[in-house]
């Protein structure tokens, strides 16, 4: 069975259910996951602190590049196992021993791909979908995703000069470096002078992650999304209410010196809007660097204002492929979620499914995965035995 969804499909509503954090978990410097809510909030959250006086052109975003502690790609996937471990603990300890009331459980990054797809038609998508216990579980296919990352990297190495490839890798590093110099491990008042002043010397890594798990949805669909949060803008409320409004996204990009660069930045800004909007994160800070990787400027954007910035950009008025429209993207996203919930029976555990977008044919499809693939996903790759045992115990 293969079904196709037209790229012109649009849901009638763009009503997004107000995102609300229900718990968080973290990955530490050693790649181990932390689930204890108090430890996660006390020890794994970063706080934004970068006064204007520090942005004087002396912050080098490639300093420490040679010592970058980079997590291997195979360990840096959207890991469903750790999400299900965290979800089990939440249901057992904070949800009266009941399963969370949602239709779909997945990662924010994967939904960002779907939301942004109408304006990113060159990016392939391959997601696996399982029905279990009345809910859909969606994750990237690890084998396909890893092979794709490897192929892309090899292609870049072959098509670029060594200098250009090195520059690209330093661009990637500069984003993590910006996070390191723009954040503190605790609120400013609780940090020592050394913690504040020595951030530029801190070893940069992409192991550490703070992951917020929220309840949200679009239209009639209720969803649970897990997504990385870069830092806290000010403080975390003691009562834990409306914590999402205190989170912030950090990004870096090259300084804008031409119309073409402004147009490319708009594409980045659209993707940033998509990932923040889905999580209910209201602020984004962009660090602008020069070609020598020195930080030249910092700009704060409010997530809710980005659609208007894009709409009012005169440079993209007559753009081929159409002007980016955030409402159109939301209506597409709503149509995809609606379609998946209609087409996949949530009580059928005999099949798994793959959702794919093929840029070469511009087709968005859903097909059944039978036999071995279904078994592989249900027995370890997506669903864990511990999670299934927990859910079976509360069905009895």
From Swiss-Prot:
Signal peptide: none annotated. It is found in: Nucleus. Substrate binds at residues 107-109, 228, 251, 275. Keywords: Hydrolase, Metal-binding, mRNA processing, Nuclease, Nucleotide-binding, Nucleus, RNA-binding. InterPro entries: RAI1 (IPR013961), RAI1-like_fam (IPR039039). Its EC number is 3.6.1.-. It is an enzyme of class 3 (hydrolase). Transmembrane segments: none annotated. Belongs to the DXO/Dom3Z family. This is Decapping nuclease RAI1.
């Amino acid at each position: 069975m293969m079904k196709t969804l037209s790229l012109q499909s649009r849901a009638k509503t763009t009503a997004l259910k107000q995102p609300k954090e229900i718990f968080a978990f973290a990955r530490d410097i050693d790649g181990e996951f932390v689930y204890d809510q108090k430890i996660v909030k006390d020890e794994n959250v970063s706080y934004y602190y970068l006064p204007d006086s520090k942005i004087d052109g002396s912050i080098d975003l490639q300093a420490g590049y040679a010592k970058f502690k980079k997590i291997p790609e195979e360990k840096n996937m959207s890991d469903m196992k750790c999400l299900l471990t965290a979800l089990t603990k939440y249901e057992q300890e904070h949800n009266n021993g009941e399963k969370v009331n949602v239709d779909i459980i997945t990662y924010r990054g994967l939904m960002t791909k779907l939301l942004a797809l109408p304006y990113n038609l060159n990016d392939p998508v391959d997601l696996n979908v399982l029905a279990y216990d009345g809910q859909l579980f969606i994750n990237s296919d690890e084998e396909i995703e890893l092979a794709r990352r490897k192929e892309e990297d090899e292609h870049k190495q072959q098509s670029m000069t060594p200098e250009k490839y090195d520059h690209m890798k330093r661009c990637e590093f500069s984003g993590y470096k910006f996070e390191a110099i723009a954040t503190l491990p605790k609120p400013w008042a609780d940090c020592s002078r050394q913690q504040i002043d020595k951030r530029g010397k801190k070893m940069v890594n992409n192991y550490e992650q703070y992951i917020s798990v929220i309840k949200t949805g679009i239209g009639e669909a209720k969803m649970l999304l897990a997504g990385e949060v870069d830092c806290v803008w000010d403080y975390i409320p003691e009562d834990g209410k409306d914590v999402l409004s205190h989170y912030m996204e950090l990004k870096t990009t090259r300084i804008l010196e031409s119309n073409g660069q402004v147009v490319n930045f708009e594409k980045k800004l659209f993707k940033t809007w998509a990932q923040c909007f889905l999580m209910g994160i209201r602020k984004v800070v962009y660090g602008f660097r020069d070609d020598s990787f020195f930080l030249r400027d910092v700009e704060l954007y409010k997530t809710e204002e980005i659609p208007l910035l894009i709409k009012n950009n005169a440079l993209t008025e007559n753009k081929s492929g159409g002007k980016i429209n955030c409402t159109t993207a939301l209506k597409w996203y709503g149509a995809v979620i609606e379609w998946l919930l209609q087409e996949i029976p949530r009580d059928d555990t005999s099949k798994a499914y793959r959702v794919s977008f093929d840029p070469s044919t511009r087709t968005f499809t859903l097909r059944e995965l039978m036999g071995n693939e279904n078994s592989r996903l249900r027995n370890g790759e997506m669903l864990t035995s511990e999670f299934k045992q927990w859910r079976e115990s509360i069905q009895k």
